[in-house]
Amino acid sequence: TYNLKKIHTGIIFQTIIGILVIALLVLGYTFILQRNYNNSALDESVARNKQCADAIHKHMSDKFVREDFDSISSIDDIGLPRYKKLQKQLNELRALNSTRYLYTVKKTDDGKLIYLVDGLDLDADDYAYPGTLIEKEMVTYIEQALSGKVVYSNKIVDTTWGHIFTACYPVEASDGTGDIIGALCMEMDMESTYACMEADNHRAFMISIIAIVVFAILANIVYIYLRKQKYIKIQQREELEKAVSA
């Protein structure tokens, strides 16, 4: 009886350890595969958006003058001919490239970042009038652009208005001074990419759980089989010992 209990405990311990090891291996392998797949999908989406953003910037880079950033600062300026012209250009370009948002930005004398020309339709619910404060999620990217750097978000940016890719470009004055007079920014929708990645993560998690359950069932079957074999061997040995002692 003592031997049976000892063997029984040993088999249980080995089975539990085996299940844990297999579970960790399955989870680890699934995590690595899923991470690599997600990174690949994200890199492809970001590269595609970068290419689109660069094309927009190339088209617009030589169309700005200092006046576009100095003379526009409030809602009162939407009637200016220059504002109307730029707004029309950005609106057409945004629609052509399926870009979600396309706009110009500047920093005011008191250090605030504000919208200037928004490329959305004028009757859009989220159209930003000149002078509207920039959302905090975009501040870091715009600040870098205003320092002279071209900035891309190399990941999905989670904002209050959705999951996006953003690119910001410094706008230099065309008068030869080299002054950074503002920034041209654009945002591409990443909602579909984010949804696919989340769905894939959930699917991978469920597959891992199913695999672990299957391994646990198989391990239990093996445990029962081994326990039975051990019991048979002990019974045979005890019968042999009895026969010898008789």
Q: Predicted segments — roles?
A:
Residues 196-231:
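Cytoplasm-proximal transmembrane signaling helix
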Residues 1-20, 229-243:
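Positive-inside N-terminal membrane-insertion signal
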Residues 151, 161-170:
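A short beta-strand signature within small-molecule sensing/ligand-binding domains used
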Residues 32-71, 188:
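Membrane-proximal extracytoplasmic alpha-helices
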Residues 5-36, 209-220:
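Extreme N-terminal signal-anchor transmembrane helix of membrane signaling/transducer proteins, especially
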Residues 161, 172-174, 185-202:
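Helix-start (N-cap) segments at beta->loop->alpha junctions
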Residues 119-157:
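Extracytoplasmic/periplasmic sensor domains and loops in membrane signaling proteins
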Residues 91-113, 207:
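Short N-terminal helix-loop-first-beta-strand/juxtamembrane motif that initiates sensory/input modules
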